[in-house]
Amino acid sequence: MADLAKIVDDLSSLTVLEAAELSKLLEEKWGVSAAAPVAVAAAAGGAGPAVVEEEKTEFDVILVEAGANKINVIKEVRAITGLGLKEAKDLVEGAPKAVKEGVNKAEAADIKKKLEDAGAKADVK
């Protein structure tokens, strides 16, 4: 049997064009087609269920309404976002607005709970 390491070295040194030509020659010699398994796999995949929806991984926390206790909501928005007093006040008064965007599910739920505890109405989208 031929030295396998030498075969691997020889194959590794081939250019892309040489590898394509080798592939064609092997297909002819062995009577196979490299494209057939791909077509069969694609056809089999089409028979399965339709596109499976990926679970959403990024969420936006929306301040829907400030509620009666606006001062506490402003304090909480400042703590969550790191905004200054004026920016946080403008955000709260301009509701509905996004407080935090692109956070994971656990963080979004935590922020929503903090806002609701402060007296606001919040939503996670």
Curated annotation (Swiss-Prot):
Q: Name one GO biological process term.
A: translation
Q: Which CDD domains does the protein's record reference?
A: Ribosomal_L7_L12
Q: Which InterPro entries match?
A: Ribosomal_bL12 (IPR000206), Ribosomal_bL12_C (IPR013823), Ribosomal_bL12_C/ClpS-like (IPR014719), Ribosomal_bL12_oligo (IPR008932), Ribosomal_bL12_oligo_N_sf (IPR036235)
> Which keywords accompany this UniProt record?
Ribonucleoprotein, Ribosomal protein
**Where in the sequence is the signal peptide annotated?**
none
**MF terms per GO, please?**
mRNA binding; structural constituent of ribosome
Answer yes or no on keyword Ribonucleoprotein. Answer: yes
Might you report a single GO cellular component term? Answer: cytosolic large ribosomal subunit
Pfam family of the protein (one)? Ribosomal_L12_N
Q: Does the keyword ATP-binding apply?
A: no
Task: Write down the HAMAP family for this protein, in alphabetical order.
Answer: Ribosomal_bL12
Of which family is this protein a member? Answer: Belongs to the bacterial ribosomal protein bL12 family.
Task: Write out the function statement from the record.
Answer: Forms part of the ribosomal stalk which helps the ribosome interact with GTP-bound translation factors. Is thus essential for accurate translation.
**Subunit details:** Homodimer. Part of the ribosomal stalk of the 50S ribosomal subunit. Forms a multimeric L10(L12)X complex, where L10 forms an elongated spine to which 2 to 4 L12 dimers bind in a sequential fashion. Binds GTP-bound translation factors.
Name of this protein: Large ribosomal subunit protein bL12
